[in-house]
Amino acid sequence: MESAMDMAEAPNWKHNACGRKFVASFSGGKDSTLALYHAMNTGKPVGLIVVMEEEGRRSRSHGIPEAVIRAQAEAVGLPVHAAPASWEAYEKVFIGLLEQAKRQGAEVLVTGDLDMPAHGCWHDRVTRRAGLGLGMPLWERDHVETVREFIDLGFQAVLVTVNLSMGMREADLGRMITHELVDELAARGIDPCGESGEFHTLVIDGPIFRHPVPVRKREVVRDGEYAFLSIELDEAGGQDVPDSDRGR
């Protein structure tokens, strides 16, 4: 169990990256990307860290292909440090990546957590073990305000995973994050940030991207209560995203 001291320090998590070198935990989704955006405005990025599935082909958190993750990193101009891990070995591998980042000059880990205490405490514990500070620029922000800021800044993200047991539909896969979708999700009783795992996104463009990340949608895959949109990097440079569903 995390100590009361850990939670008492939570307010500092918002600003710990200011003026400091940081490494960002990167899922490829909207929250980690928005946190990276804010941290880049005040701190000095040294890279991104990603934990992959055991085979090393997809990210452990969002199931994003390694080629797409690396294309995102290239688009924002940062190196990415990735390592494969099972769920059982996840913490050990994550701490190893943090220690590697520290050797390269990082002082703080930046994450896109909003308000899940378990997530905040876990990141607090592993950063302490690695000798780093913790920065969470989005911590305790209003969910609707956060996703609307993401849209208004010009980021573009597509839904790639949905939890069918939490009100999401298979037909939601492939939709862009827009103000209209935010309104619709709220009307359906769904958190527009998907903070509890209702859905995951893939960011393909935005103000910190030097160019869009070209992806191609392939097929929908069902796995129990989840549905996934299989995607791949489009080496030809096309963009398989419907213009009519782009954010304003």
What are these regions (language model features)?
Residues 2-248:
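Nucleotide-activated chemistry modules centered on ATP-dependent adenylation/adenylyltransferase
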